[in-house]
Amino acid sequence: MNGNIITETKENITDAGVKKSNVKLINAGTTLLSFKLSIGKTAIAGKNLYTNEAIAGLCLENEEKVLNKYLFDLFNSKFIDLEKGGFNAFGKSLNSEFLRNEVKIPLPPKNIQEKIVSEIEVLEKEEQEKKEKVGVLKSEIVELFENSLNGDVKNYRLSDDSIFEIGIGKRLLKDEILSNGKIPVYSANVFEPFGFINKNLLNDFSRDSVLWGIDGDWMVNYLSKNIDFYPTDHCGYLRIKDNQLNEKFVAYFLEKEGKKFGFSRTNRASIDRIQNIKIPLPSLEIQKQIVSQIEKVENEIEILKNDLKTIPEKKKEVLKKYL
């Protein structure tokens, strides 16, 4: 549940199961609200359905007074934020009594609700269009890579230590992380620093580095030369000794090949497995051309993503304007 319309679920219930249980039918269009773990997450029932005990259906007794979509917008925009007050803490859950007695729903006239819904739908349309554009641009990146392999390529095995330097970091204890540290520490998430420290594990940062997460969600990042970083034992790093290879291009292909291998939290991207990977690469000139084109596309994606980050607050502003 993530603000979407639900029409299909992983699990289904039979007619016999309905008769033996106390589940109640929830009508299409009803706002769905998560009760447990991911408290406050919302969705809309895309058709008549039943839910388990972790999901509440906010069924309306008087649809002449309240619009279903207005109710959804209140919760989905976090205008009514159930995550506040510690109710999203592990082991805690909401219940119907709390919703009935503690959650206050602002109820403007129906024509105001309609204005709110209409203005938020404009933002939702903008949001959807930008998400689709991001998808198109990501497909363009894939196409650029695929096209780069149409000519002459050479296969490089990452175990070739005459070309590649590959290693993993060292375990850090929490008390080694410093509030005033300057050097970012990377763990399984190679995009967001785990913390900061004031000592180095590696001594040479004169070459670009490619980082990958060993036992988290599969991800690969690229760091320019002269940027210090500290890898933990959940982070692998790769450096290239051959000037005929472009580090960014290698990073892109490593990410692609890692997906083929199915690296994940359970299928660890250990050094042995990484070294078994072969990467097909075109000439250095083509590598640089492709990287330059991809960087332009990535800049467009970043602009769109930044725009998307502003939309939730814009939805809140619509609600604040009328309420």
Summary of predicted features, one role per range:
Residues 4-11, 27-28, 37, 44-50, ...:
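Basic, amphipathic alpha-helical recognition segments used for DNA target recognition
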Residues 31, 209-210:
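Structural motif
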Residues 104-191, 280-323:
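Non-catalytic DNA-recognition/assembly elements of restriction-modification systems
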